[in-house]
Regions:
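A short helix-turn-beta junction within AAA+ P-loop NTPase domains corresponding to the substrate/partner-engaging
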Residues: 11, 129-146
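A short hydrophobic beta-strand->loop->alpha-helix junction that borders the nucleotide-binding pocket
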Residues: 13-22
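Switch/connector loops and helix/strand junctions flanking conserved nucleotide-binding motifs
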Residues: 22-26, 123-128
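Conserved Walker-type P-loop NTP-binding/catalytic site
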Residues: 30-72
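Conserved Walker B catalytic segment
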Residues: 58-122, 129-132
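Conserved small helical "lid"/interfacial subdomain of P-loop NTPases
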Residues: 139-167, 173, 184
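Amphipathic alpha-helical "lid/sensor" segments that cap RecA-like P-loop NTPase cores
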Residues: 161-207
């Protein structure tokens, strides 16, 4: 989706890491876009308090990160652009909750901002059940079916030349998640010569 939208000059796209300060990261990434940086400089917007650019003479520095983003979004709207933010492997952590709370404010102010989040069902469920983030209940959701156990087992049998018993064990570990299927396959491929499936489980569990 993001790759297709990037082809449209009216769209700006930003990918955020949910384990970092997402508001700060969003501001930094928007500011680093050449077309937007020029607009902010010409508008004499001073974001130096957040390490974005330099102090501007006769301009009061903006000292609140939400205000920084509101000014950025105002200029994005003014220049007929739209902003898509994507977040992969989202969890119900403090950074995500703060970001989504601010995102609700930006929506109410009618800024052209859009959010695409992906993650495990249980993580999305926990997040939308937060009383401060009720708008997520109304947000469109696409539920992806888990990968077929039989198909995963066959892939592992064909690629690694495993017997059905070993392939069954690996397929069960993925629980049908595409990411888990890829990670487990990668770890087994890298360690197959001198490690068993049980040997790689501690590293797999950390992913």
């Amino acid at each position: 989706i993001v790759s297709e939208i990037k082809k449209d000059e009216e769209w700006l796209t930003v990918e955020l890491n949910p384990t970092r300060d997402m508001l700060q990261s969003l501001a930094a990434k928007i500011y680093s876009m050449p077309q937007m940086n020029k607009i902010f400089v010409n508008a004499k917007l001073d974001f130096s308090a957040f390490g974005l650019g330099v102090s501007i003479e006769n301009a009061a520095p903006v000292t609140d990160i939400e205000n920084v983003l509101e000014l950025m979004l105002e200029n994005i709207k003014k220049h007929n652009k739209r902003l898509l933010i994507s977040v992969d492997e989202v969890t119900n952590c403090e950074f995500v909750k703060v970001f989504v709370s601010s995102f609700q404010i930006f929506l109410r102010q009618d800024y052209p901002i859009f959010l695409l989040m992906t993650g495990l069902f249980e993580n999305i469920y926990d997040l939308q059940n937060d009383k401060a983030l009720t708008f997520l209940y109304r947000a469109p959701k696409i539920m992806l079916e888990p990968l077929s156990f039989t198909a995963v087992r066959k892939h592992y049998m064909d690629i690694f030349e495993l017997d059905q018993r070993e392939a069954d064990k690996m397929a069960a570990l993925t629980k049908g998640y595409p990411f888990a299927f890829q990670v487990l396959g990668y770890l087994y491929w890298e360690n197959r010569d001198d490690h068993t499936i049980e040997d790689i489980l501690p590293e797999y569990d950390q992913c």
